[in-house]
């Protein structure tokens, strides 16, 4: 979805800049409909791809942050309230507490 929005914005910008370059206003007719093509420079494509990667990375970190998982790798054990791993067996006594 974000890539299609970016493409539409670029199409609008390219039509505006080509109209300014020619000195006369160019309009798209009904016959041009689905056959409108956009030519981009290699540098522009690379920068757009970098921006899309940053957006995807940001959304992935938001999602995994909300779900309690790490982005890089899978966390095997559940974390307790104090940041320590919870024991995998129920009813066992932690070594930190000991018998009092």
Curated annotation (Swiss-Prot):
User: Which ranges of residues are annotated as propeptide in this record?
Assistant: 20-55, 85-100
> According to the UniProt entry, where is the signal peptide?
1-19
Keywords for this entry?
A: Amidation, Cleavage on pair of basic residues, Secreted, Signal
Q: What is its main location?
A: secreted
> Which Gene Ontology cellular component terms are annotated?
extracellular space
Listed under GO biological process in this entry are: inflammatory response; positive regulation of cytosolic calcium ion concentration; positive regulation of flagellated sperm motility; tachykinin receptor signaling pathway
Q: Does the keyword Signal apply?
A: yes
- Tell me the GO molecular function terms: substance P receptor binding
Q: Which InterPro entries match?
A: Tachy_Neuro_lke_CS
Physiological role:
Tachykinins are active peptides which excite neurons, evoke behavioral responses, are potent vasodilators and secretagogues, and contract (directly or indirectly) many smooth muscles.
Protein's UniProt name: Tachykinin-4
Q: Which organism is it from?
A: Oryctolagus cuniculus (Rabbit)
